[in-house]
Regions:
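Bacterial Sec-dependent N-terminal signal peptides
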Residues: 1-24, 438, 523
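C-terminal outer-membrane/trafficking sorting elements
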Residues: 18-21, 441-450, 454-523
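Short beta-strand/loop motifs in extracellular/secreted proteins, especially
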Residues: 61-63, 96-98, 149, 466-470
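Internal "kinase-insert"/substrate-recognition segments embedded within catalytic cores
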Residues: 97-107, 121-122, 141-146, 158-267, ...
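A conserved alpha-helical element in kinase catalytic cores
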Residues: 123-143
Length: 523
């Protein structure tokens, strides 16, 4: 199967070229894989007790910050610091996950244009790099994810631990990753600790209050309008199968979403929409009027979160090494409807096979793991607050680690062994040579248009066809309709407002093959 070219991968290339002249905000922290030094000085006595006391209220505390990256050392007075996380808060010592807000107390204060940084404590991860590797592969594969790096963190002169630094999903992320920040950005709710409010994209009615525990609006908070998200969920849940199939590509960036789902499945990353129905963002892009999917919180990738529930590694009754490509928990209507559609599921398999061939394999991922291991080894050894031993760290790069019961216990899969085992299983489940490639699909066949004459609506049906450009022109040659559908084989076009007369349909596919047909509107 030939490698496909994807919008985000191309965007990343052009942004890289542009950056010769103009840097993206955050490049000092995230451009190169490096280990930052973060030195926080708190002036309160018993500062950590205060941090813990503020955990439930998410209140920030003041601290002075000295940050060292590959470009130099920078000092910032009075940044805001607070503890964060759900399961990660159960880390058995004081090495908790936390967040820094540069301008919480000093208005406009930023580092390299960045306002906030998140610090993950590598809970349940002897390798100390699960999240970083997962995000690296996702980003390379053209999926929207936060940038990440590593850091040695000091509190009041004491080495607190080795952390993964993760970019905040906010307007600055939208600026560089999507090139649009005017729309609504929603974060999936945590639904942690037994909460029965998963961000499952189920339609619960038209009232915003029915969703406030499930989704949090992160932009345009003053307006606080969830109508667009509710309308999308209405579409997902209440459309006919034909309408869902034909219109989904108009509602969201479908290629990137299918790739995002495929990566969650391959990495058995089920603390996501696929499983727990959390840890994602949805952004309504005002430039395209489409929804875009952003991953979040990848610390349970490589099979550390059980498929189907169950409370910990190995639970849930499903072997995460042998999860089928179309696995999802119940009540995930977006995935259920995609997988129920022959054409959309085929589109998913196309993306799946492309990633399996080019990214999710030992040849691609093992060198990334080795590079990170060599970079962080001495820092991990120096971390006296980590959950696992130095031997566990070394062994978990390639092999499973077992460490008793409780949080972080059970069998934790080795990074390299997980990839090789998962690939071996998936190659036995999917014959990618039998998945028709994009290049083989681009010849349009059996084009139909009916009824003809029409009065209110016309239906277009065809076989094959990728990279389609559909144009309808009136008798004077004026363009009255244009569409670029993907992964569908039918389309309904409302014509009830069009004038009576003769119209010309022109179908062009990516290989340049064109078909035309004349029809009329009579009333």
């Amino acid at each position: 199967m030939k490698t496909r070219k994807h919008t985000l991968a191309l965007m990343a290339f052009f942004i890289g070229v542009t950056n010769v002249f103009a840097q993206i905000e955050g490049d000092k922290i995230f451009k190169n894989t490096q280990i930052l030094t973060i030195e926080l000085t708190f002036h309160q006595t018993s500062f950590f007790d205060s941090l813990e006391a503020n955990y439930l209220t998410a209140e920030y505390m003041k601290a002075d910050l000295v940050l060292t990256d590959s470009t130099g050392t920078y000092s910032y007075p009075e940044v805001g610091v607070r503890l964060k996380g759900n399961s990660t808060y159960n880390h058995p010592n004081n090495k908790k996950a936390f967040k820094i807000d540069f301008n919480e107390y000093v208005s406009g204060q930023k580092h390299d244009g960045i306002k906030k940084l998140n610090f993950s404590n590598n809970f349940k991860d002897p390798s100390m790099m699960r999240e970083k590797v997962f995000f690296d592969v996702c980003k390379a594969a053209g999926v929207l994810v936060p940038r990440s790096n590593f850091a040695n963190v000091y509190f009041n002169g004491t080495l607190w631990g080795f952390y993964t630094v993760v970019e905040q999903i906010d307007d600055q992320f939208l600026d560089w990753a999507i090139l649009d920040d005017d729309g609504n950005l929603f974060k999936a709710g945590d639904n942690f600790g037994g909460s029965n409010t998963p961000a499952d994209l189920v339609y619960y009615g038209s009232t915003a209050s029915d969703y406030t525990d499930r989704y949090e609006l992160k932009t345009n908070e003053d307006v606080n309008d969830m109508t667009d998200l509710i309308d999308f969920m209405d579409f997902v849940n209440n459309s006919t199968s034909a309408n869902f199939e034909s219109q989904l590509f108009n509602k969201m960036e479908l290629n990137e979403y299918l790739r995002s789902v495929a990566l969650d499945n391959m990495f058995s990353n089920f603390d996501s929409y696929t499983g727990s129905a959390r840890n994602y963002y949805m952004y309504h892009n005002m430039s395209t009027d489409k929804w875009e999917w952003v991953k979040w919180d990848g610390n349970e990738a490589f099979g550390s979160y059980p498929a189907g529930g169950g409370g910990g590694p190995g639970g849930g009754g499903n072997n995460v090494l042998t999860i089928d490509p179309d696995y999802h928990d119940a009540d995930r209507p977006l995935l259920e409807n995609i997988f129920a559609s022959t054409s959309l599921y085929h589109a998913y398999l196309l993306e799946y096979c492309d990633i399996l061939e080019n990214y999710f394999n030992s040849s691609y991922i093992d060198p990334i793991i080795d590079s990170h291991y060599n970079l962080i080894k001495s820092s991990v050894y120096a971390d006296n607050n980590k959950m696992y031993t130095d031997a566990d760290f070394d062994n978990n790069i390639s092999s499973n680690v077992s460490s008793g019961s409780g949080p972080g216990g059970g069998t934790i899969y080795g990074l390299k062994s997980f990839i090789s085992s998962r690939v071996s299983y998936l190659e036995g489940e999917i014959d990618c040579d039998d998945i028709v490639s994009v290049e083989d699909m681009d010849k349009v066949e059996n084009l139909e248009l009916f009824p003809n004459p029409a009065s209110e609506q016309i239906t277009l049906k065809w076989e094959n066809g990728v990279g389609l450009d559909i144009k309808i022109l009136d008798s004077k040659g004026v363009l009255v309709y244009q569409n670029n559908p993907e992964y569908i084989n039918s389309l309904n076009v409302d014509v009830d407002s069009w004038a009576t007369g003769i119209y010309h349909l022109v179908f062009t596919s990516s290989n340049g093959t064109a078909k035309s047909q004349t029809f009329s509107i009579l009333r």
